[in-house]
Design a protein with these regions (language model features):
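AMP-binding/adenylate-forming catalytic domain of the ANL superfamily
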Residues: 61-71
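Two-component histidine kinase catalytic core, primarily the HATPase_c
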Residues: 42
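Short acidic/histidine-centered micro-motifs embedded in hydrophobic/aromatic stretches
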Residues: 29, 69, 75
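Thiotemplate assembly-line natural product biosynthesis machinery
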Residues: 1-23, 77-80
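Phosphopantetheine carrier-protein modules
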Residues: 18-37, 55, 59-61
């Protein structure tokens, strides 16, 4: 799966919990939760959605690594390869 495809899946998932967000303005290196004002419960639901969509199990111990868009893309690329 390409980086672009993974990014589109991430944005699709984020749009479910932050439908008003402008994802074109989302920084690839900034904290997604802060930029989109997402609480921990919504972020957890987003990660569960990624697991459902991609079949990638994301252990709770890895949540702290998933801060920015780049973090998410890199993490998912590694597990999907």
């Amino acid at each position: 799966m390409t980086e672009t495809e993974i990014r589109e899946i991430i944005i699709s998932g984020l749009s479910q919990i932050a439908p008003e967000a402008d994802f074109e303005e989302l920084s690839p290196t900034e904290n997604i939760r802060e930029e989109l004002d997402i609480d921990s419960f919504d972020f957890l639901n987003f990660l569960i959605g990624l697991d459902d969509k991609l079949g990638v199990d994301i252990p709770e111990s890895d949540y702290e690594k998933l801060i920015s868009m780049n973090d998410l893309i890199g993490y998912l690329q590694e597990r999907l390869s």
